[in-house]
Amino acid sequence: RAALMMGGKTVDEIYWWKGKGFDTLAGRKTLPSVAALNAAIAAQIDKARPAYATPAQCVAHSAKIMHGDGKSVGDYAFQRPEGAASIYRASPDFDHSILGAATAVINEMDLGQGEATDVISVGLSATDYIGHAFGTEGLEMCIQMSELDRSLGEFFDVLDGEGIDYV
């Protein structure tokens, strides 16, 4: 949805999440760098993942709150059991993958390296998925914000390192 809304009908490249990797419009080829990223994601997404370390600023937000059918929110650190790819989108790993795809497209297409202005629109959606799944005040959202900040910092470091201006 975000890709189509930001890109419109005439884009050079467009990608969105589809199950276990990034997909594009029917009849278009996926860039080799995005295909390689998809292969890397597919190799990891069904594997067990340990919990994220709890950042110091998030300790106070960790409070298990029980709700229907023995389920809880407020203390989940995004550990995933083997075979749990379906919960990938509602984790910091998702936004990290989106920024990885953006970096792959920038590098493969040499965006920001020519005379013409290049535009890349990146829609990060994990915060929305996490908010709907767990709420906005618990450990889950605090870890997401911390990891999103780290991932964006890494992304901007790449752009800065390549001399690419951005807004």
Language-model features, listed with the residues they occupy:
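Aromatic-residue detector
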Residues: 110, 114, 118, 140-141, ...
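Loop/turn elements at helix/coil->beta-strand transitions in domains of secreted/extracellular proteins
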Residues: 113-120, 163-167
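Metal-dependent active-site segment of extracytoplasmic phospho-/sulfohydrolases and closely related
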Residues: 146-167
